[in-house]
Amino acid sequence: MNLRRSWRQLLQTLCLGLTAAALPLAAHAQANYPDRPVRIIVPFTAGGSSDIQGRLLAEHLGKLYGQSVVVENRPGAGGHIGGKFVADSGPDGYTLLLGSIGLHATYGVYKNLNYQPARDLKLITIVAEMPHVVVANPALEANTLAELTALAKAKPETLHFGSAGVGSSVHMVGELYKMAAQAPIVHIPYRGSSAATNDLLGGQIQLLFENVPTTIGYIQAKKLKALAITGATRSPALPDVPTAAEAGLPGLTVTSWTTLAASKDVPDALIEKISADLRRVYADPAFREGLERLGMTPVGNNPADARAFVERERARWNQVIETEHITAG
């Protein structure tokens, strides 16, 4: 018994010693972060709103760090291919995720996910909020939101709207329109916003409820027509486009948002360090103006506030999922 107790004491001492030795190493690694390139995983195709934000963030964060910050697109499954990749990326914090409503708030549409975003990802900040814009192919026989609703009711299930995938913000805002207007339109999911936008331009679909950054160039070039903005106020980027409330549909007042997140295995101290670094990026007028030019409102809050915000949004969007019986299988 004494021998067994001695071995147990020896093992406990060794474990404590190893833990104590590891603490200074971990603290040193965090203090020197980053000492090599950082990746921002954008879980959607290039050219969409998330990709645009990711590249702007990478540019300014790279300047701050004096290290390369690169964007890597990993699309699929409504963003969850990229989300799972980051969740499994380990504790070093060198692989970050540009997240979205679909990743953090509406993942309940996927019944067989092999990870749980709320459990397996740690939020660092809300990057930005932005309204959506209801855009149509110029050939559509509707120039206002009221005309769109009348057309949808007159020709039920003949109008099709695209999205970046089931559960994406572009999809969910379309579903919110269906609820608010009682408009029988049909959802067509795509692998990303770029593919959906291309089909809208080509006339294969008639509508998108897309983020402003993805569509503003086409609207300004008159290749697409904007019917309404979903924000509470008009967008400075599209000042002539009325809000949904002004157009008679206040139930479509909504914004989407993006996040920066990391694996749950990243220590809280490193999460807080990255958050503090981001606040320095947000203090740069050039970064804020870059977001604002694209119709986005910069946020840059701390991890605790980001978590509270996402929890409120998850509850809100779950109501839409349940009411519309939305599922991706």
Go through the PLM ranges and name each one.
Residues M1-L14, A21-L25:
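Twin-arginine (Tat) signal peptide motif
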Residues A29-D120, T158, Q182-F209, P298-G300, ...:
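N-terminal (or domain-start) structured segment
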Residues D88-Y94, G108-A195, A244, W257-G290:
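Hinge/capping helix and adjacent helix->loop/strand transition within the periplasmic-binding protein
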